[in-house]
Amino acid sequence: MGKGKKLLITGGRGMVGRNLIACAARSGWEIIAPTSVDLDLRNAEAVEQYIRRQLPDVVVHAAGVVGGIHANIADPIHFLADNAAMALNVVMSSFRSEVVTLINLSSSCMYPACIEGPLKECDILRGPFEVTNEGYALAKTVGLKICEYIDKLPNFNYKTLIACNLYGVGDNFDPRRSHLLPAIIEKIHKASQCGSESVSIWGDGTARREFMFAYDFAKIIIKALEVPELIPSSMNVGVGKDLSVLEYYSLVARVIGWSGEFVYDLNRPVGMRSKLMDITHLTALGWVPERSLEGGIRSTYQYYITGNEVYE
C-alpha cells in the first residue's frame, strides 16, 4: 500500500516518530511529518486546516506529552489536557476530511492498576487507573474510544495499537522526563564515568516491565497500515515477556561494563507492579519483534554516547 501514498505522522520528532519515518521511507511512503513549530496539535482549527490542505491517505497519531513516573506525578494537568486535545483534534479532523485509515498509538499505562496480567484489550476501563499516571492514562483512553466509535462505521479503519514500554534510537535520556530504560542507561553510564560504586533504584527492584525496541514497533505500525482491516479496533503490541526492574539494571550494567552495587530507595514510587500484556492478536498475525533485548540496549547505548541515529 505504501508506494506513492501520502502518510501523515504526528510526533515525528519523538522516538517512535523518528523510527517510523525511517521505516516508512524504506517502504515507499510519501511522508508528511510536521513539527510542533509547524503545527500545534492542541489548536483544533489549525489541525483541521492542515489536514484539509494536505489530504493524507493515512494518518499515524504518534504525538504526545510523555515522561516517566516523576514527570507524570509533577504535571498531571498537561499530561491529561494536552494529550486528550491532540488526540481529539487529529482523529476528528481526519474523520471530517474522510481519511479512511488512521492508526492511533497508545500505551500499556492506560490499563487499570488492579488487573492481574497478562493484560488483555478487554481489560481497559475495568478498574481505576494507576494513580501515578492517571492523567496520561485518561487522555489515552479518550483517544482509544473515539477511534473505536469511528472504526464501527462502514469504510473506516481507525485502529489503536497499545504499546508496551518502548526504547531505542532517538530516546530521551533527560532524567526529568525519561522512562525506565533510558533512565537506567543514563544513571549507569554516569556512574561508570565518574567511578561511582553504587546506583540507586526506585523501590525494591521487583516491579516488572515489558520492553520493545522502537524500530520493531515501527515495522508493526507499517504492517498495520497495509492491512488495517485485519486487526481489531485495539490491539496490544509487545514482546510477550517481562523482566524485573533489577534485571534491567543488571543487563544495562553488563552492556556498559559497570560492576558496582545497587541501592534500593524504598521511599520512591514504582507504579504498577506488572504491566505484561497479552499479545494473542499480534501473534495470530505472525507479527513478532526481531531485536533481542540485549542487542537493542547495545544499539540504544551507542546512540546515547555517539548521537548517531542509525535506525534498523
UniProtKB/Swiss-Prot annotation:
Principal EC category: oxidoreductase
Name the keywords, alphabetized: Isomerase, Multifunctional enzyme, NADP, Nodulation, Oxidoreductase
Q: Which CDD domains does the record cross-reference, listed alphabetically?
A: GDP_FS_SDR_e (cd05239)
Q: Where is this site: Important for catalytic activity?
A: S107, C109
Q: Which residues are the active-site ones? A: Y136
Q: Which InterPro entries match?
A: Epimerase_deHydtase, GDP_fucose/colitose_synth, NAD(P)-bd_dom_sf
- Which example biological process does GO assign this protein? 'de novo' GDP-L-fucose biosynthetic process
Query: Is Transmembrane helix there in the keyword field?
Result: no
The entry's NADP(+)-binding residues are G11, G12, R13, G14, M15, V16, G17, K140, H179
What pathway does this protein act in? Nucleotide-sugar biosynthesis; GDP-L-fucose biosynthesis via de novo pathway; GDP-L-fucose from GDP-alpha-D-mannose: step 2/2
Reaction catalysis annotation: GDP-beta-L-fucose + NADP(+) = GDP-4-dehydro-alpha-D-rhamnose + NADPH + H(+)
Which amino acid positions bind substrate, per UniProt? Answer: K187, W202, R209
Which Enzyme Commission number(s) are on file for it?
1.1.1.271
**One annotated GO molecular function:** isomerase activity
The protein's induction, as recorded, is:
By flavanone naringenin.
Keyword Repressor attributed: no
Matching HAMAP family: GDP_fucose_synth
**Which function does this protein serve?**
Catalyzes the two-step NADP-dependent conversion of GDP-4-dehydro-6-deoxy-D-mannose to GDP-fucose, involving an epimerase and a reductase reaction.
Family affiliation: Belongs to the NAD(P)-dependent epimerase/dehydratase family. Fucose synthase subfamily.
Protein name listed in UniProt? GDP-L-fucose synthase
Organism, as annotated: Azorhizobium caulinodans (strain ATCC 43989 / DSM 5975 / JCM 20966 / LMG 6465 / NBRC 14845 / NCIMB 13405 / ORS 571)
